[in-house]
Amino acid sequence: ITRDHHALLWINPHTSFYFRSELQMVSDEGLDAYGAVTWGQFFVYQGFNRTAGWMHTSSGVDNIDEFLETVVKRAGRYYYRHGSELLPMQARTITVLSKTATGMARKTFTAYSTQHGPIVRKLGDKWVSVSLMRKPITALIQSYSRTKAGDYAAFRKIMELHSNASNNTLFADSKGNVAYLHSN
């Protein structure tokens, strides 16, 4: 709190000074925001514009779902049980390059996924798929759009996209509105 009893939103008190850069972003389309960005982001992740500020906290909220998949192999393909149906798993070949003492090595493997998300491990005889932020374009839209929100009503409308999957959000505007959005 300032000496005049105004709230402050601190950016990144938990990270080192060099973890995130802080900058101002201005455009002819109405963007004028200052704050912290992470490498490669084209939006202010947490910061403020002329009338509003936002920041994020992390917590142990339930923001990921895991599914135990019953997997069956038939005719060289994997299927998973969904209700009373067997649905085909999506399979994708991925090649990873790595440096070795004699040069570059390639390792190719198959990644599987269901409608719930990618398979990440095996638990007993079940395969485990995870569902977390499966809307990357919507997440980018939400992250960029909130930099232009001038008040709580506009910010809340943007947050209705529900694609900021791993953080809680704190918000304050020049009208005196203060909000906490839990794992949005």
Regions found by a protein language model. Give the residues of each.
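Mature extracytoplasmic enzyme cores
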Residues: I1-N184
